[in-house]
Regions:
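Alpha-helical membrane insertion/targeting regions
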Residues: 1-142
Length: 142
């Protein structure tokens, strides 16, 4: 599952940027579909990953890493960013679903949506980067 999440993030970041591009092109329905699918996939992958980490753990797989002494600190940085991003992502989706009308078009919620969307985008990219760094330090650089 860990490898799946690492690879999924390689595809998630470009899909995120592609989906944002659809909103900028005023293709709001396509933007909504892409973002809802991406959000569902990410949340499902993270939940499955967390279940596996609780059942199997990761420390025994990383004991031979030359970075063993700093892995916990690196992981905490990643966790803080990823939890904050998850909260932002859920807020972005929930507010968008509640506030935007059908058919989709810009409205009074658009300014807030752009701001929280930018924070979510930055968080998702940082989550991916810190996750990749941790993955490499813990499991690849042995």
């Amino acid at each position: 599952m860990l490898d799946f999440v690492v690879v999924a993030m390689v595809f998630a970041v470009p899909m995120l940027i592609f989906g944002i591009g659809k909103a900028k092109a005023k293709q709001f329905a396509t933007h909504k579909r892409i973002m809802l699918v991406l959000s569902a996939v990410l949340i499902t992958a993270v939940c499955a990953f967390e279940i596996e980490m609780r059942l199997v753990g990761w420390q025994h797989l990383a004991e031979s890493s030359p970075y063993w002494s700093v892995l916990e600190e690196i992981l905490w940085v990643h966790i803080i960013i990823s939890v904050s991003t998850t909260i932002c992502l859920v807020a972005t989706v929930v507010f968008a679903l509640r506030k935007f009308s059908s058919p989709l078009r810009p409205g009074s919620h658009s300014s807030f949506h752009r701001k929280i969307g930018k924070a979510t985008k930055a968080g998702l990219i940082l989550t991916a980067v810190t996750g990749w760094i941790f993955y490499w330090m813990a499991f690849v650089a042995v």
